[in-house]
Amino acid sequence: MRPEPGGCCCRRPMRANGCVKNGEVRNGYLRSSTATVAAAGQIHHVTENGGLYKRPFNEAFEETPMLVAVLTYVGYGVLTLFGYLRDFLRHWRIEKCHHATEREEQKDFVSLYQDFENFYTRNLYMRIRDNWNRPICSVPGAKVDIMERKSHDYNWSFKYTGNIIKGVINMGSYNYLGFARNTGSCQEAAAEVLKEYGAGVCSTRQEIGNLDKHEELEKLVARFLGVEAAMTYGMGFATNSMNIPALVGKGCLILSDELNHASLVLGARLSGATIRIFKHNNMQSLEKLLKDAIVYGQPRTRRPWKKILILVEGIYSMEGSIVRLPEVIALKKKYKAYLYLDEAHSIGALGPSGRGVVDYFGLDPEDVDVMMGTFTKSFGASGGYIGGKKELIDYLRTHSHSAVYATSMSPPVMEQIITSMKCIMGQDGTSLGKECIQQLAENTRYFRRRLKEMGFIIYGNEDSPVVPLMLYMPAKIGAFGREMLKRNIGVVVVGFPATPIIESRARFCLSAAHTKEILDTALKEIDEVGDLLQLKYSRHRLVPLLDRPFDETTYEETED
C-alpha cells in the first residue's frame, strides 16, 4: 500500500463491511483512543489515530493460563528434584555419565560459577543443549544448510556426522530485508572493494585506518537517518557498551527499560551512573521515575542530577514489542531529559521508508538525542552506528573507547552497507528496496495472523517482524526445536534465564526473502508440531471472516 500524498502510510481504504485493511477497525470493533484493554486474561495495548500517535498501535500480551503456569513450575520442580538426585548418584559414582563431575586435580580450585548457575547448566541446560549453536554451512538466507551432529555423552560434546541437512527454512536469522545473500549488486560491489582495499585495515580510525569509505558511509548514514552527523563502529554490541560510558558518568541518572538488551545494560553499568529501571513500555512507570529524579535529586546530597538519560529500544528482540516512542519523546521534552534510542532491530525493518521506529511513527529525528543502530540485521553486514548532532559525534570521536581503540570497519563490509542502504533509499535506480520493505510488512502481518488463527499465544506488536510463540514448559523447549528441525524448519528457542522462568518461547524472525510458499510450509509444520506438543494455549483464537488473500484479511475474535 503506497501512502497518499499528504497522508499517513498506515491508513487503509475502507471496506464495504466497515473494516479497514490491516488497520484501524480490528476484530469487529473500533479501537478506543489511547486505551489498554484487558479481557479474560488478554492484554491489548491499543492506540487510535489522534493525539501523539499518527497511526494505530496494537500490541498483545496474552496472560499465561493459570493451569499452564502451575504445570510449568511443576516441570521445573521435577527437573530440579531429579537434578539433585543425579548429583547424589554422581557423588557415589552410580551415575553412568561422569562428565558433570569435577576433576580430581581441580577439587581445590576456586569455583567459576555460582552454585545455582552451575546446577542449572549441568542438569537442565545440558538436556536441551543440542538446540543451540547449530553450525550452518551456507548463506543465512531464506533457506540454510545445517551440518548434522550427534552427541554420545548426553550433549556434553558433539561430533559431526559428515551429513548436510539441506534446504532448511530459516526462521531464526535477523535477515529482515533479505540482503544476506551471495549474489546481486551488494555482493558484487563488496567483491570489487575487497580487490581494491583488502579485507582489513589493521589500524584504528585515529591512526592510519580512516579510509575514504568510512567517510562516505558516515555521510550516507547521516543522510539516511535525517541527522546532522553519524559515526560508525565495527561491532554492534560495542556501539552500546562502549559509548554509553562516554555520555554519562558519576552524578548522572540512567532510566532503562526492564527488557533492554545486554549491551545497553553493560554500557549503563560501566558508566558509573545511577541506574533506575522502569516497567517495560510503561509510560506511567517512566514518568514516576522522572518526577522522583527531579524532586529528590541525587541520594544523600539531594543535588540535581547532571544528566538524565532514557534508554529504550525500537523493537525489543525477545518480546516483539515496539517502543511507545511518541510518549517517550513527550516525557523527555516535559522533564528535560535526554533520549538514547537503540534501533538495532527496527532500522530497515520498520517505517514506510525503512528508517526505523522514528519513521514508523512519523516523528522528527531531531527529537531523539542519540540514535543508535546496527548493520548486522537489515543490512546483512556487521557493525553499528550512532547519529545525532554534530557536536555529539565530534565528542564521541575523541571520548568513545570504541572509536579510539577499536580497529576500523572492514572495507568490503562497509561497501555491503553502502550498497544496501542506497538500495533502501532508492538511490540505486531501482525500486527493490521499497519492495523489500513492503514485502517484509506483508509477511509479518500474514505470519502473525495465521499463528493466532491456529490458537498459539503470540507476543508483540502486529507490525513487528520478531514473533515470539509461547512454549512455557521446559520440556517443550527442546521438543519444539527438535521437531521443527526434523521437518526442515530452523527455529530459535529461548528459555530461562534469557526469559522469565515461566515464559519460555520460540522466536521467529520474518524476512522479505520469505515467499508465501515458504511461510505456508513453515506454518503447516508449526501447526502440526503445535498439535503434537499441545502448544495452542490461546483463548482468543482469530477466525477469518472472508477468504484471505495474502496481504489483507478481516477477523473476528472468539474466546474458547
Curated annotation (Swiss-Prot):
Q: Which CDD domains match?
A: KBL_like
Where are the bilayer-spanning segments? 65-85
Q: What is its main location?
A: endoplasmic reticulum
Q: What's the source species for this entry?
A: Mus musculus
Provide the family line. Answer: Belongs to the class-II pyridoxal-phosphate-dependent aminotransferase family.
**Activity regulation note:** SPT complex catalytic activity is negatively regulated by ORMDL proteins, including ORMDL3, in the presence of ceramides. This mechanism allows to maintain ceramide levels at sufficient concentrations for the production of complex sphingolipids, but which prevents the accumulation of ceramides to levels that trigger apoptosis.
Tell me the pathway: Lipid metabolism; sphingolipid metabolism
Q: How does it sit in the membrane?
A: Single-pass membrane protein
Catalysed reactions, as listed in the record: L-serine + hexadecanoyl-CoA + H(+) = 3-oxosphinganine + CO2 + CoA; octadecanoyl-CoA + L-serine + H(+) = 3-oxoeicosasphinganine + CO2 + CoA
An individual GO BP term: positive regulation of lipophagy
Cite the record's note on assembly. Component of the serine palmitoyltransferase (SPT) complex, which is composed of SPTLC1, SPTLC2 or SPTLC3 and SPTSSA or SPTSSB. The heterodimer consisting of SPTLC1 and SPTLC2/SPTLC3 forms the catalytic core of the enzyme, while SPTSSA or SPTSSB subunits determine substrate specificity. SPT also interacts with ORMDL proteins, especially ORMDL3, which negatively regulate SPT activity in the presence of ceramides. Forms dimers of heterodimers with SPTLC1.
In terms of Pfam families, this protein maps to: Aminotran_1_2
PANTHER family, per the entry: CLASS II AMINOTRANSFERASE/8-AMINO-7-OXONONANOATE SYNTHASE, SERINE PALMITOYLTRANSFERASE 2
Q: Which GO terms describe its cellular component?
A: endoplasmic reticulum membrane; mitochondrion; serine palmitoyltransferase complex
Protein's recorded name: Serine palmitoyltransferase 2
> Which lineage do the record's taxonomy fields give for this organism?
Eukaryota, Metazoa, Chordata, Craniata, Vertebrata
Q: What does this protein do?
A: Component of the serine palmitoyltransferase multisubunit enzyme (SPT) that catalyzes the initial and rate-limiting step in sphingolipid biosynthesis by condensing L-serine and activated acyl-CoA (most commonly palmitoyl-CoA) to form long-chain bases. The SPT complex is composed of SPTLC1, SPTLC2 or SPTLC3 and SPTSSA or SPTSSB. Within this complex, the heterodimer consisting of SPTLC1 and SPTLC2/SPTLC3 forms the catalytic core. The composition of the serine palmitoyltransferase (SPT) complex determines the substrate preference.
Cellular location of this protein? Endoplasmic reticulum membrane
* Keyword terms: Acyltransferase, Endoplasmic reticulum, Lipid metabolism, Membrane, Pyridoxal phosphate, Sphingolipid metabolism, Transferase, Transmembrane, Transmembrane helix
Task: Give a brief account of the tissues where this protein occurs.
Answer: Expressed in a variety of tissues. Expressed in brains cortices (at protein level). Expressed in brown and white adipose tissues. Expressed in liver.
- Result of knocking out the encoding gene: Adipocyte-specific knockout mice have reduced adipose tissue mass and develop hepatosteatosis with insulin resistance and hyperglycemia.
Question: Which gene codes for it?
Answer: Sptlc2
- What are the required cofactors? pyridoxal 5'-phosphate
Task: Return the InterPro entries for the record.
Answer: Aminotrans_II_pyridoxalP_BS, Aminotransferase_I/II_large, AON_synthase_class-II, PyrdxlP-dep_Trfase, PyrdxlP-dep_Trfase_major, PyrdxlP-dep_Trfase_small
N6-(pyridoxal phosphate)lysine, modified sites: K377
